[in-house]
Amino acid sequence: MNSFVSTVLLLSVTIALVSGYPSQLQTTCVTKAKSCTMFFLNGVYCTECTYSGTLELKIGSTCTFSIYEKKVASQPNENSQNEVAQCKQSSCYSNQYVPVDCAAAFGNEYITYIENQ
């Protein structure tokens, strides 16, 4: 009976240790940039800044590439996409992008990282 308990205990510890290891390798690469232009419009100085970023996420053999862009203007006009982020995503091995929800593609942590410049 004692050897049975030892065997069960050894198997339980082995399963717990193995389950703690990731089954697939995950790598992440994030870039960010900010560019601003200043201009004079109707007697007022205005600025327009573009926040952009990319996220390459590889999990095992699956790889996605996401692009984030957000324009912020000091004097928005009715046609601007002010404060609305635009995101698109593709496979790392393709250049055919589809629009995606930014929160789904990047997550709040990476969006905050890109916008805090």
From Swiss-Prot:
Top-level lineage group:
Eukaryota
Q: Does the keyword Plastid apply?
A: no
Pfam families named among the record's database cross-references: DUF1505 (PF07403)
Q: What tissues harbor this protein?
A: Expressed in the uterine epithelium.
- Protein name listed in UniProt: UPF0375 protein Y45F10C.2
- Keyword presence, Glycosyltransferase: no
Identify its protein family. Answer: Belongs to the UPF0375 family.
**Which species is this UniProt entry from?**
Caenorhabditis elegans
A GO CC annotation recorded here is:
extracellular region
Swiss-Prot/TrEMBL keywords: Secreted, Signal
**What is this protein's function per UniProt?**
Negatively regulates the egg-laying rate by promoting retention of fertilized eggs.
Effect after changing residue 36 to A: Promotes egg-laying
Region forming the signal peptide: 1-20
Q: Where is the protein found, in the record's own terms?
A: Secreted
Predominant localisation class: secreted
